[in-house]
A protein has these predicted regions:
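Short, well-formed alpha-helical segments that are part of the catalytic scaffolds
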Residues: 12-27
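Cell-envelope/extracellular polymer assembly enzymes that use nucleotide-activated donors
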Residues: 2-4, 35
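Acceptor/aglycone-binding surface of glycosyltransferases and processive sugar-polymer synthases
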Residues: 64-68, 72-82, 87, 99-181
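Structural signature of the Rossmann-like NAD(P)-dependent dehydrogenase/reductase core
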Residues: 4, 40-43, 65
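Conserved donor nucleotide-binding strand/loop of the catalytic core
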Residues: 34-38, 48-82
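A conserved acidic beta->alpha catalytic loop
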Residues: 40-49, 95-96
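Alpha-helical transmission elements in cytosolic ATPase-linked domains
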Residues: 18, 22, 46, 50-53, ...
Length: 182
């Protein structure tokens, strides 16, 4: 089995080596093959040269590079299109998403074949500036009022999906997506 790790990057030259090192320390606990798909979203720093160098040293590291910044959703979609793994995870390169959780997420999917996805959610806004917390809460209240699909407050992009879920997402025809709502 292979796990594709999709990592959107925008001006993350310093975070990339730290992320890769942290993931390498965790992947041996899972025992599946890994492929990393970094998506450079039009960075203006040294993100692209860092990705080139890492890819030249590590055969399981691949990257895509956008000519300009198209946004995280476009980067995620491009990564999903490129991923070939039996399982696919989406992670932030700045280690907001603890790589150790991937071990638990994979174990949960392995022991529950009826599940297509295991996701994460933020349970507290502690440490967040009050104004950001206010607008985040307001966003979820508004979106749940106008949408037919309920969004869980604190939903994160960090999730582990089976291939069949990825294929279903790729079939969604909407151009402007919000992956936390999928």
């Amino acid at each position: 089995m292979t796990i594709s790790v999709i990592v959107p990057c925008f001006n993350e030259e310093e975070s990339i080596p730290l992320f890769h090192e942290a993931m390498e320390a965790v992947k041996y606990k899972i025992r599946d093959q890994f492929e990393y798909i970094f998506v450079n979203d039009g960075s203006t720093d040294q993100t692209l040269p860092v990705l080139r160098e890492l890819s030249s040293r590590c055969p399981d590291v691949h990257y895509l590079s956008f000519s300009r910044n198209f946004g995280k959703e476009a980067a995620l979609y491009a990564g999903l299109q490129e991923a070939s793994g039996d399982f696919v995870t989406v992670m932030d390169v700045d280690l907001q998403d603890p790589p150790e959780l991937l071990v638990e997420m994979k174990a949960m999917l392995d022991s529950n074949p009826e599940l297509d996805c295991v996701g994460t959610r933020r349970t507290t806004r502690e440490g967040e500036p009050p104004i950001r917390s206010f607008f985040a809460n307001l966003f979820y209240k508004l979106i749940n009022k106008i949408s037919q699909v309920e969004m869980v407050d604190g939903a994160r992009d960090f999730r582990l999906m089976r291939r069949q879920m990825v294929e279903a997402i790729l079939e969604v025809s909407e151009y402007n997506r919000f992956s936390k709502g999928i």
